Amino acid sequence: MGLSMDRSPYSRTGDRDRGCWYYLRYFFLFVSLIQFLIILGLVLFMIYGNVHATTESSLRATEIRADNLYSQVVGLSAAQANLSKQLNISTLVKDTVMQQLLTTRREVERINASFRQCQGDLITYINYNRFIAAIILSEKQCQEQLKEGNKTCEALLFKLGEKVKTLEMEVVKEKAVCSKDKDSLLAGKRQAEMQQEACGKAREQQKQDQQVTEEQLRKVQSLCLPLDQEKFQADVLNVWRDSLVYRSLDNIGYHYSLMPEFSSLRRTCESLPGIMTTKVEELARGLRAGIERVTRENGELRRQKLELERAIQGEREARTRAGTEAQARETQLRTECARQTQLALEEKAALRTQRDDLERQLEARKRELEQLRTEVDVRISALDTCVKAKSLPAIQPRLPGPPPNPPPIDPASLEEFKKRILESQRPPLVNPAVPPSG
């Protein structure tokens, strides 16, 4: 029983903690040794002693020793009874202590597991601190970018306002120029209409003059074309011969044949048809020259008329083209002004949207940061509580020291961390209560 108790795990808990059975073992060992020595002495006495001489004394001594031994046995019996009671009590205490030991070991294991979990949470929160630091830096960068974006937005709005004012001034100037061009074109149109009307009247007058001239030309041609010089000369000669002057010259020749001037007079009278023919021919040539001159003038007038018509047509085309160009330029300016205004409004709206998005992102980052700070504070306080609650010695895992140069933040891990935090902050979906059946 002593050996089985020696092999119990309670005897091995420590060198300093001594149980009841440890002392009882030495007690029984000393008792057994004393009994062995007594028996050995008796045997030696019986073998080597004088039995007959010392029987009475030995008997008395034996009685005395027996009485002593009886008293010792009685005392040892009482001590054994007491020790049995104490042993029973110690067994109960041992069972209680063993139960407490098992409970303590379970508690130690639980505390170790909690401590390991706290160490893992500590490592996790150290990593979370890196993410939080990255989020804080990102928040600062977002704030700086928001400030820069606000400055850029204000500068762009100012530039767009100046550009809109410049465009409005240019539109006003272009409208004034278009109005001046329109007025000049209207004046040119009225002048061209007046010139066209005058040209129409001149053309009608020229047509009438041309008709009259053509009629006169036809008459003159009808009169001049049949004129034959030889026939005209023969007719004039016949008329001359049939005239009274010719006959009178013939009769005078008989009476005044001795006069010296008569022959010259006769030659003059005879050459009179030729002179008349020459004069008529000169008149015909002059008439032909006049007809040719009138024809040339008519051709020149026709050419001027065609040039004037072409000039009028060109003026009309130029006026139409100028009006079309002015209208197209005005339409283009209006379209460009509307487009620039629309672009300015779109850029302004885009900048406002971007600024609102940056503000929303900044607010979300602030909320995430506050939530993370709160969660980290809670976890750190829980970790401190776990560390303080660990009272028994245990092999504590060595905390890894912070690396001198932390690795860079992975954007994917950072986004996953943000998503996990946002999902943890979502309100749980509450299922509607199902009414009990029956």
From Swiss-Prot:
Its main location: membrane. Residues 393-438 are annotated as: Disordered. GO terms for molecular function: identical protein binding. GO terms for cellular component: caveola; cell surface; perinuclear region of cytoplasm. It is a single-pass type II membrane protein. Residues 399-410, 429-438 have a biased composition (Pro residues). The chain crosses the membrane at residues 27-47. It comes from the Eukaryota. It is found in: Cell membrane; Membrane, Caveola; Cytoplasm, Perinuclear region. The keyword Transmembrane helix applies. Keywords: Cell membrane, Coiled coil, Cytoplasm, Glycoprotein, Membrane, Signal-anchor, Transmembrane, Transmembrane helix. Residues 289-383 form a coiled coil. Residues 1-26 are cytoplasmic. Expressed in lung (alveolar endothelial and bronchial epithelial cells), kidney (endothelium of peritubular capillaries), spleen, liver, adrenal (endothelial cells of the zona reticularis of the cortex and chromaffin cells in the medulla), pancreas (islets of Langerhans), testis (germ cells, interstitial cells in neonatal testis and spermatids), ovary (stromal endothelial, thecal layer of developing follicles, luteal cells within the corpus luteum), intestine (endothelium of capillaries of the intestinal villi) and pituitary (pituicyte cells in the neural lobe) (at protein level). The keyword Glycoprotein applies. Residues 48-438 are extracellular. Glycans are attached at N82, N88, N112, N150. One of its GO terms (biological process) is regulation of vascular permeability. Endothelial cell-specific membrane protein involved in the formation of the diaphragms that bridge endothelial fenestrae. It is also required for the formation of stomata of caveolae and transendothelial channels. Functions in microvascular permeability, endothelial fenestrae contributing to the passage of water and solutes and regulating transcellular versus paracellular flow in different organs. Plays a specific role in embryonic development. Homodimer. This is Plasmalemma vesicle-associated protein. It comes from Rattus norvegicus (Rat).
